[in-house]
C-alpha cells in the first residue's frame, strides 16, 4: 500500500495550540511598548470622530486589587471596541495623589509634620511616596493589556493640574456658589479633619438609648395649652437620643407641627409625648399605670420653653419636618452644631450653633465642669449620671444601630460644627440645575439615574475645606478681623496669580507665598486661609483640569465615566457638582457603573476570610487574557463572582476560542488572498453560508459592543465558535480541505470562507482577548497593518440571499436533521459501527411539506459530506413512518434515520468506504474520487 500522506493538504501553522499566556504576554507587551502601539493607534485614528472615556483616578496607594482590574479592563474593552468602530478614542489614565491616606503612610514612616521636619518637607515626602505608588500600579495596569498614554498620565499632583484645580474653584466662586459657615460636618477625631460623604462607612455600634425629661419653664402656660390648668405635678417634654454626649450642645426640642401630642400623667408628674408613641414609651420606661389627660397639635406648643436638665439655661420647642414616629418620643433633641437637620432648623429659628467639642473629639474648656477635656465617646456615662442626679433620666438601655465611621480608621465619627467652606446647593440653583442635567445623561444600568437623583435631591451643602497638609490649597485670603473673603474681583485675580505660581512650583508655592507679593499694602489686613481642598474636589474637577486641558481631547467633553457603583456618591457626584457649578452642564454623556467583586459563594472579598483573588497571581499563572475574558463574560451590572473555579471555566472557554482560531490558521496554510480568493458567486454554497454565519454573528456582536453588553459578546462568540463552526461547518469541511486538489475551486472556496471568518473573528476578540488577537494577527495571510488595533471591524463579510434555493432557512433545517442523525449514529456504536464513515444512513420521510427533502435530494452525492458518512440515501415512505421507530420533525417534515454499515472498502487516503476502491490500476488501493484529486482534474463541489 502506498503512503498518500504527502498528497493531502494537512493543516499546518506556527500558531501554538497552547496559549502559555503567562509566558508570552510580557514579550508582546515589550513589543507594544517598543513600537509605541498607543501612538500608532492615535496616528491611525487622527481626524476620526472622537469618543472620550475619562478615567476616574484610582488612589495612588497600595497594589492594585481585583476590583481595579475589573475597572481598567472594562474601560479598555470599550476604548478598543470604539477604535474598531471608527472612533478616535484616546485614553489618558490618571491617579488621585493628594489626601489623608498618603499623609498617614508618610506619618507612619517619618512622623508628623512639625515634629522632625517642616510641612514643606512633609509635602515633598508625600509627593515622592505618591509617585512610587503610581509607578507600581502603572506596571500592573499595563500588564493587564490596557492601552493608554502611560508615559503621560494625569496626576492630580501634576503642577499644571494643581493650578487648574485652583482655577476651577475660582470659577465656582465667580458663579456665586461658595460660602463660609460654621456648619456641622462629618468629623473624624483621628484624622482631625472633616470627611466627605464618600469617606463615610457605616458599621454596627452599641450606644446608650436614653429618654430625658426637659421640665417646662412656665408650667401653667403648658397646662393651659392642653386646657388642663388643674393638672397636679410638674410637666416635662421628653426627648429620646442615642448620643447623650451631644446634650451639652442642645439648643431646642423639635416637634412635628401636625402630630398629636399627649399630656400623660405618671407617678405624680405629667410628660408630653407624641400620642402614637405613648404606649411604646410607657412600656420602655416601665410605667404600668398612666393616663392620657389631653392632646394638642405640635404647632400649639411652638416656642414654649423648657429647662435644660443640667446646662443652666432653657430652650424652645420648635417645629420641623424632620420629626418622625419611627422611634423615640416624637420630640427630637436638637443640637445645631451636631447634625445637619438640626443645623437647618436651627438657622430657621436663629439658634446658636454651639460647638463644645474640639478637633480631637474632647470637650472644650468651659463646657461643663465634669466634661471639660473628656473624649465625647467616653462622656456618655458621665452625662447619664448627671441626668440621674438632676432627676431628668426616665430610662436608659443599650441599643445596637448603624453608625457612621471613618473609611480610613474604621472608628466612629461625629458631626461637629466648624468654620468651613461650602459649595452651596441652593444659593445659585446648583441642586435644581444638577437634577436637570442628570436627566440628559444615559445611566447604565438605568437604575443609576434614580440613585443619583435621590442623592442630589437630599444632599447637604458640600464642605470642600479640609485641615490637612498634603492637598491643593484653597488659595483664599480673608480679612483678619471680619474673616470676610477678599472682594470678589480681587479674590479671582489673586487666585489666578497663585495658580500661575503653582503651575511652575507646585502647591508649595502657596505656602511659600508672602501675601504682600499679591496684595501689596493690603497684606497687613488679610491672612491666608490655611485649609486645603477636599480630594473629591481634586478628582471631581478633572473634567476641567484634565479633559479641557489635554490636547488629545481637542476641546471635546467626556463621553463616558465608568466606575464602581459606589461612585454615585463619590466621583460621579463631585464631578457633576463641579461641572454644573462651573459650566452649567454635566461633565459626561454616559455613566456606566459596575458591581463589586465577590467570591464564588457571593461573599465580599476579605483578607481575613482568605477569599481574595490577586490579579497579579492570575496573570502570572493563567495570563491577562483569561482575566480579561472573565471580566467580559461576567454581567458587570451586579456582583461579579470570581474564584479559582470560575477562572478555570474562563480558561476552558478561552481554549475553545483559541482552538477555533488555530483551526482557521492551520487550514489557511498556502493561501494567498491576493491570488487565491474565490469570488462569492463562485463559492461552494456551504462556504457562503459559513461567511453569512459570521456576518450575522458580527452584527449581533457589534450591537452588543455598542450596548456595552460584553457578556453577550462572549456568549455570541462562543456560540459561533462551538456550535455554528465547531459542531457543524469545520467538521464538514475537513474532508474537502484535506483531500481536494490543493489549488481547486473546491478547496480555495473553503479557504476563502475561512479567511473571511478569521479576519472577522480576530477583530471580535481584540477588545477582550487583546494578546491572543495580536498573536493571531501575526499568523493571518495577506498584506495588513502591523496591529489589529489600528483598523476597524471587518467589512468583507457576505451571506446567502433569502430568495436563494439553499438559503439560511434550508441550512437551519439541515443542521437540525444532522443533529438527529448524529444521535442515531452515536446509538449504533454499540452495534459495532465505531465511526461515522463506517456508516450508511438511509433518511426516510413520509411528507415534505416545506421542501427540505427535495432540496437535500438536489445536493446529490454531496449530501453525504454534510452528514460525514460514506453513504447517504433518501427514501420516501409512501405508507408513512412506523411510529415505533425513532422519528422527528424538521420544519413540517417527518423523517427517520436508519443506520447500517457502509458498503464497499475503506479508502486509505480519504477514509470513506466506497465500492470503487482499487478500480484504477495505477492507484489500486484508493477510491475514484481520490484518484481524480491526485491525478485527474479533481472533484467538483457545488454545495458542500
Curated annotation (Swiss-Prot):
CDD domains: Anticodon_Ia_Ile_BEm, IleRS_core
Localization, UniProt: Cytoplasm
GO biological process, one term: isoleucyl-tRNA aminoacylation
Main location: cytoplasm
Short name of any one Pfam family annotated for the protein: Anticodon_1
Cofactor descriptive note: Binds 1 zinc ion per subunit.
EC number per UniProt: 6.1.1.5
Class of the enzyme per the UniProt entry, highest EC level: ligase
Top-level taxon: Bacteria
Cofactor(s) annotated in UniProt: Zn(2+)
Matches recorded under SUPFAM superfamilies: Anticodon-binding domain of a subclass of class I aminoacyl-tRNA synthetases (SSF47323), Nucleotidylyl transferase (SSF52374), ValRS/IleRS/LeuRS editing domain (SSF50677)
Domain remark from Swiss-Prot or TrEMBL: IleRS has two distinct active sites: one for aminoacylation and one for editing. The misactivated valine is translocated from the active site to the editing site, which sterically excludes the correctly activated isoleucine. The single editing site contains two valyl binding pockets, one specific for each substrate (Val-AMP or Val-tRNA(Ile)).
Known function: Catalyzes the attachment of isoleucine to tRNA(Ile). As IleRS can inadvertently accommodate and process structurally similar amino acids such as valine, to avoid such errors it has two additional distinct tRNA(Ile)-dependent editing activities. One activity is designated as 'pretransfer' editing and involves the hydrolysis of activated Val-AMP. The other activity is designated 'posttransfer' editing and involves deacylation of mischarged Val-tRNA(Ile).
Quaternary structure (record): Monomer.
Protein name: Isoleucine--tRNA ligase
Amino acid at each position: 500500500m502506498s503512503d498518500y500522506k504527502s498528497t493531502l493538504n494537512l493543516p499546518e501553522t506556527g500558531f501554538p495550540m497552547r496559549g502559555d499566556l503567562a509566558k508570552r504576554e510580557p514579550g508582546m507587551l515589550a513589543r507594544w511598548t517598543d513600537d509605541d502601539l498607543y501612538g500608532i493607534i492615535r496616528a491611525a485614528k487622527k481626524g476620526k470622530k472622537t469618543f472620550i472615556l475619562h478615567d476616574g483616578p484610582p488612589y495612588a496607594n497600595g497594589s492594585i486589587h481585583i476590583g481595579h482590574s475589573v475597572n481598567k479592563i472594562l474601560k479598555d474593552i470599550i476604548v478598543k471596541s470604539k477604535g474598531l468602530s471608527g472612533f478616535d478614542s484616546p485614553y489618558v489614565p490618571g491617579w488621585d495623589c493628594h489626601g489623608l491616606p498618603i499623609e498617614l503612610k508618610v506619618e507612619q514612616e517619618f512622623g508628623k509634620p512639625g515634629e522632625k521636619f517642616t510641612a514643606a518637607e512633609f509635602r515633598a515626602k508625600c509627593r515622592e511616596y505618591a509617585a512610587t505608588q503610581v509607578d507600581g500600579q502603572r506596571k500592573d495596569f499595563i500588564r493587564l493589556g490596557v492601552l493608554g498614554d502611560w508615559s503621560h498620565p494625569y496626576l492630580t499632583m501634576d503642577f499644571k493640574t494643581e493650578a487648574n484645580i485652583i482655577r476651577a474653584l475660582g470659577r465656582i466662586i465667580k458663579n456665586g456658589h461658595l460660602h463660609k459657615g460654621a456648619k456641622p460636618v462629618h468629623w473624624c477625631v483621628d484624622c482631625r479633619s472633616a470627611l466627605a460623604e464618600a469617606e463615610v462607612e457605616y458599621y454596627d455600634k452599641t450606644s446608650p438609648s436614653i429618654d430625658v425629661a426637659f421640665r417646662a419653664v412656665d408650667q401653667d402656660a403648658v397646662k393651659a395649652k392642653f386646657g388642663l390648668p388643674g393638672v397636679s405635678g410638674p410637666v416635662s417634654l421628653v426627648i429620646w437620643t442615642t448620643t447623650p454626649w451631644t446634650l451639652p450642645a442642645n439648643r431646642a426640642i423639635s416637634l412635628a407641627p401636625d402630630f398629636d401630642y399627649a399630656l400623660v400623667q405618671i407617678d405624680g408628674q405629667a410628660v408630653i409625648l407624641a400620642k402614637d408613641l405613648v404606649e411604646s414609651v410607657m412600656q420602655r420606661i416601665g410605667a404600668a399605670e398612666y393616663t392620657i389627660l389631653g392632646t394638642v397639635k405640635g404647632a400649639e406648643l411652638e416656642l414654649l420653653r423648657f429647662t435644660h436638665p443640667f446646662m443652666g439655661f432653657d430652650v424652645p420647642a420648635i417645629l420641623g419636618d424632620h420629626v418622625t414616629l419611627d422611634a423615640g418620643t416624637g420630640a427630637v433633641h436638637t443640637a445645631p452644631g451636631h447634625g445637619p437637620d438640626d443645623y437647618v432648623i436651627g438657622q430657621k429659628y436663629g439658634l446658636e450653633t454651639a460647638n463644645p467639642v474640639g478637633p480631637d473629639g474632647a470637650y472644650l474648656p468651659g463646657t461643663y465642669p465634669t466634661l471639660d477635656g473628656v473624649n465625647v465617646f467616653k462622656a456618655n456615662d458621665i452625662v447619664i449620671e448627671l441626668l440621674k442626679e438632676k432627676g431628668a433620666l426616665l430610662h436608659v438601655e443599650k441599643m445596637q444601630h448603624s453608625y457612621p465611621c471613618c473609611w480610613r480608621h474604621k472608628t466612629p465619627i461625629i458631626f461637629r460644627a466648624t468654620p468651613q467652606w461650602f459649595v452651596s446647593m441652593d444659593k445659585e440653583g446648583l441642586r435644581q440645575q444638577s437634577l436637570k442635567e442628570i436627566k440628559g445623561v444615559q445611566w447604565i444600568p438605568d437604575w443609576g439615574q434614580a440613585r443619583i437623583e435621590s442623592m442630589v435631591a437630599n444632599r447637604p451643602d458640600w464642605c470642600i475645606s479640609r485641615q490637612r497638609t498634603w492637598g491643593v490649597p484653597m488659595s483664599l485670603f480673608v480679612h483678619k478681623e471680619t474673616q470676610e473673603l477678599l472682594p470678589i474681583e480681587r479674590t479671582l485675580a489673586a487666585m489666578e496669580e497663585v495658580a500661575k505660581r503653582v503651575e511652575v512650583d507646585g502647591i508649595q508655592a502657596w505656602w511659600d507665598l508672602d501675601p504682600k507679593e499679591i496684595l501689596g499694602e493690603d497684606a497687613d489686613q488679610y491672612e491666608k486661609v490655611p485649609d486645603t481642598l477636599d480630594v473629591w474636589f481634586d478628582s471631581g474637577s478633572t473634567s476641567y483640569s484634565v479633559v479641557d486641558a489635554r490636547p488629545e481631547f481637542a476641546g471635546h467633553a467626556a463621553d463616558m465615566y465608568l466606575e464602581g457603583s459606589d461612585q454615585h456618591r463619590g466621583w460621579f457626584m463631585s464631578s457633576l457638582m463641579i461641572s454644573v457649578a462651573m459650566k452649567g452642564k454635566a461633565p459626561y454623556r454616559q455613566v456606566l457603573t459596575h458591581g463589586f467583586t465577590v467570591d464564588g459563594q457571593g461573599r465580599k472579598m476579605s483578607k481575613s476570610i482568605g477569599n481574595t483573588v490577586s490579579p497579579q497571581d492570575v496573570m502570572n499563572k493563567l495570563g491577562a487574557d483569561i482575566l480579561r475574558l472573565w471580566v467580559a463574560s461576567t454581567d458587570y451590572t451586579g456582583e461579579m463572582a470570581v474564584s479559582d473555579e470560575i477562572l478555570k471555566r474562563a480558561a476552558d472557554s478561552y481554549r475553545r476560542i483559541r482552538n477555533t482560531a488555530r483551526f482557521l490558521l492551520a487550514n489557511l496554510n498556502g493561501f494567498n488572498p491576493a491570488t487565491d480568493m474565490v469570488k462569492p458567486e463562485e463559492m461552494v454554497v456551504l462556504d457562503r453560508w459559513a461567511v453569512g454565519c459570521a456576518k450575522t454573528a458580527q452584527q449581533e456582536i457589534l450591537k452588543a459592543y455598542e450596548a456595552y453588553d460584553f457578556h453577550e459578546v462572549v456568549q455570541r462568540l462562543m456560540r459561533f465558535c462551538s456550535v455554528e463552526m465547531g459542531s457543524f461547518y469545520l467538521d464538514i469541511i475537513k474532508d474537502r480541505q484535506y483531500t481536494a486538489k490543493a489549488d481547486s475551486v473546491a478547496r480555495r472556496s473553503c479557504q476563502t470562507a475561512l479567511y473571511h471568518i478569521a479576519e472577522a473573528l480576530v477583530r471580535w476578540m481584540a477588545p477582550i482577548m487583546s494578546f491572543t488577537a495580536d498573536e493571531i494577527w501575526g499568523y493571518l495571510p495577506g498584506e495588513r497593518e502591523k496591529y489589529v488595533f489600528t483598523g476597524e471591524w471587518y467589512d468583507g463579510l457576505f451571506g446567502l440571499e433569502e430568495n436563494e434555493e439553499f438559503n439560511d432557512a434550508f441550512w437551519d433545517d439541515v443542521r437540525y436533521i444532522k443533529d438527529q442523525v448524529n444521535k442515531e449514529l452515536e446509538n449504533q456504536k454499540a452495534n459495532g459501527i465505531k465511526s461515522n464513515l463506517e456508516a450508511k444512513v438511509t433518511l426516510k420521510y413520509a411528507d415534505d411539506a416545506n421542501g427540505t427533502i427535495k432540496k437535500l435530494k438536489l445536493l446529490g452525492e454531496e449530501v453525504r459530506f454534510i452528514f460525514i458518512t460514506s453513504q447517504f440515501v433518501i427514501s420516501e415512505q409512501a405508507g408513512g413512518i412506523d411510529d415505533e421507530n425513532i422519528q422527528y420533525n424538521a420544519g413540517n417534515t417527518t423523517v427517520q434515520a436508519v443506520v447500517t454499515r457502509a458498503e464497499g472498502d475503506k479508502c486509505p487516503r480519504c477514509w470513506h468506504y466506497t465500492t470503487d476502491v482499487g478500480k484504477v490500476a495505477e492507484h489500486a488501493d484508493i477510491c475514484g474520487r481520490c484518484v481524480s484529486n491526485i491525478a485527474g482534474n479533481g472533484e467538483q463541489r457545488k454545495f458542500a
